[in-house]
Amino acid sequence: MDKVYDKCCGIDLHKKLIVACFKQGNRQEIRDFGATTRELLEMADWLKEGGCEMVAMESTASYWKPLYNILETCGLKAMVVNAQHMKAVPGRKTDVKDAEWIADLLQHGLLTASYIPDKDQRELRELVRYRKSLVGERARELNRLQKMLEGANIKISGTIRDINGKSARNILEHLLSGRQIDSAEYDILYEKKVIAHNLKATKEQIIDDLNGVMSALQKKMMRILLNHLDELNAHIRELDDDIDNFMKPEEKEAAKVIQDIPGIGNTS
């Protein structure tokens, strides 16, 4: 069978061990490396010195990511392949090591590379994934806040739509100060716009809904929860800025176009 690569390397990845089989024509050399950055750089130097044209590795857990990043940074071409695809290729001998088998398949062009986005796209995806996890954590905290308020018989959700909004926060800060809301206090808060002017509920309904009973422990827990929400909101805003700065002009333009579709927003 014709050889696609004269000099190539197959890599068998483990958590703390990397087995590399470097093929050069009909000759091969197998070396073991650790998984530290220093050892990965040593392997990259070894492959560069040998004139390696392509490196192939299995998509094993997330072990491939640091190695792929280092090879990419060092200017070496690499591909990540699906383990099931390799198992489907016939002809493997029982005594052949995984790294040797990967190298042999690579040398003869029998491997199909999985799609790996470029470095900028990978980093953008990491930002988006992390933002999504923080948004999920914020939603869970808001649910905890809602249950905490219900336990104190404060029915803020029936008065204010957005429990994470400015109006809700102003009211909660007022209640945490230990003050109840009577008719006169309502008028003062309304004048100061602590209570928003666009609420649909009546004055009497708002007063009834917001006057609950909170113990000292409930107030302490709510304060911790609100502080955590502030941190999450700040981190999400920071990630929004990072994502915006990471996007290329054409990506931003495409994002604007797709937002014309109903239900699609900037964070979708």
Q: Which residues does each PLM region occupy?
A:
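A detector of single, family-specific signature residues
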Residues: M1-S268
